[in-house]
Amino acid sequence: MLLKKMKASLAVALVMSMSLLTACGGSAGKKADTTEKSGETQAAKEGNAAEGGTIKLGVLAPLTGTNAEYGKGFQVAMQMAVDKINADGGVKGKKFELSVKDSKGDQKESSDLARQFADDDEIMAILGDFTSGCCMANASIVDEAGIVQLSPTASNPDYAPMSKYCFSIMGLQSAEAPFAAKYLLQKYAGAKNVGVIYINSDWGTSAFSNFEKAAKEIGLNIAASVNYVQDEKDFSSLITKLKSANPDHVIILDQGAVPQIINQIRTSGWDVPLAALGPGTSEQLISQTGKNSEGLLITSPFFFDPENKELTAWKDEFVSKAGFQPTIHPACAYDTVYLIKTAIEAIDGDITREAIRDKLAEVDYTGVTGPIKFTENGDINRQYMICGIENGQYVIKEGFDYSKEN
């Protein structure tokens, strides 16, 4: 019933038809170049590195570690896009080829790999990484080399402005975190005193900072806030601290560690209502938490509407290849490949790194996750809905219209 109620609201954002491969040119500004390129780098950038029969794209993703689910989702979804594009004739007579490397979710590892891609003239653009922290660590590298780094998921608002070569399509924590405070917790859940537990990373601190600012503005009290480092396993002391503050709701700001935190909260005997910002509608979260996640509320800019046949077909193909249900994260990853394709199709002349960057900034495209048009900074604006877990399944609680002011 909820899905039928939201059908109209989702029509724009969940558009996916067999014309997914088409796009129309738009206009978008972009920040000025922030570094001077060396003569050697500039010459390579302006040359045609795609002279052969393939266009190579570098992929950075956490294939191992806490966020491995999302990294594998990247890999599967991007390969799906490449396979379809190549089967349909490629782009300008050339085939796409992916070079996938495991960043492990580690900033130094990601930067080392980004440097390898940047130094390889055959790599025409970089897709990834998953975390904002990794993407931000790579910004100076891609800026110096003059190569696009298009992240499916980086949402720290400080990332894209770091270089004219940095792009992201997830949306921004400067929008999602305030939505979680004002609409999910205060308006929908009726929260007055909340506890916050968040990952101490570039993404996590940005999410918390934006959440905290919004909470102060709307009079939502933060009873206690705690944070932890990447790959933490034992959250018992943090849970004890939150519990002692007696919040009426707890929100978790993270992706990979959310199931562990939920399980440890419930096994401690605490039945506080829970919310999360970050994991999306992850089926692995449900499988790893079982009844512990029943009633969990989450923010999401996207939902797989079972009434959308094309979207369902995409989802089914992903499941057959990945072995798990997709969230918005692999859907965004799929879209990034088509964004590069669309940019290349618009190039009049040699396919170069710089030409890809310039045409990417102008793209106006509708993909799996809905309309995509870059701001001057190289990120996009998204709307958000409230989803929840009922009887072991995700449902829409409130759609995009919920945040519209009367």
Regions found by a protein language model. Name each.
Residues 69-76, 91-159, 169, 228-235, ...:
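Beta-alpha junction/loop-to-helix N-cap segments that form part of ligand/metal-binding clefts
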Residues 21-40:
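Bacterial lipoprotein signal-peptidase II cleavage site
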Residues 59, 117-130, 150-152, 194-198, ...:
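Periplasmic-binding protein-like
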Residues 265-334, 388-390, 394-396, 400-405:
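Extracellular/periplasmic periplasmic-binding protein-like sensory domains
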Residues 166-230, 249:
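An alpha-beta-alpha
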Residues 320-330, 341-394:
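Segments of small-molecule ligand-sensing domains
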Residues 51, 58-79, 101-108, 130-131, ...:
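Extracytoplasmic "Venus flytrap"
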Residues 142, 208-299:
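Extracellular/periplasmic bilobed ligand-binding domains
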